[in-house]
Amino acid sequence: RVPVPLPLAACWQRRVLGYQAAIITQRIEKAQPIAQYIEKIPPESVAIVVKQMHDAGVWHADLNVFNLLIDAQQQIYVIDFDRARRFDVVDSKHRQNNLLRLRRSLIKVRGEIGQQWYEQFRRAYLQLAKA
């Protein structure tokens, strides 16, 4: 099970070239993007959530430090599944794509600290993949 905000309502409207959709989710009290707190967040806890998402067959189109939230209880949540895709199995290419997108985001927002944190996250993710 992937930790996400509880969906409350959704709608969609047909357009000439596709559709437009919206979803309203429950607010997660005191949740903040992980970008501001990576020094305090164990990379392993984020690796577990990202691995759960991939194991559930979900590929996130924009996995970045603003689409991973942490609440006051240190629970990690994934948000913004716009353009996400569902697969029977998320293959290694798509998994790697997600990890590299997160890496770019970490480096852009947090520089060297982001790079160091990502390396720990990646090691944890790969360890989980072996288990």
Predicted regions located by residue number:
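Conserved alphaE helix
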Residues: 41-52
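Short, glycine/acidic-enriched loop or turn micro-motifs at the edges of active sites
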Residues: 29, 65, 83
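Glycine-rich, phosphate-binding/catalytic loops in enzymes
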Residues: 3, 42, 94-97
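AlphaC helix of the protein kinase catalytic domain
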Residues: 31-39
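Conserved ATP-binding subdomain of kinase catalytic cores across diverse folds
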Residues: 1-32, 51-56
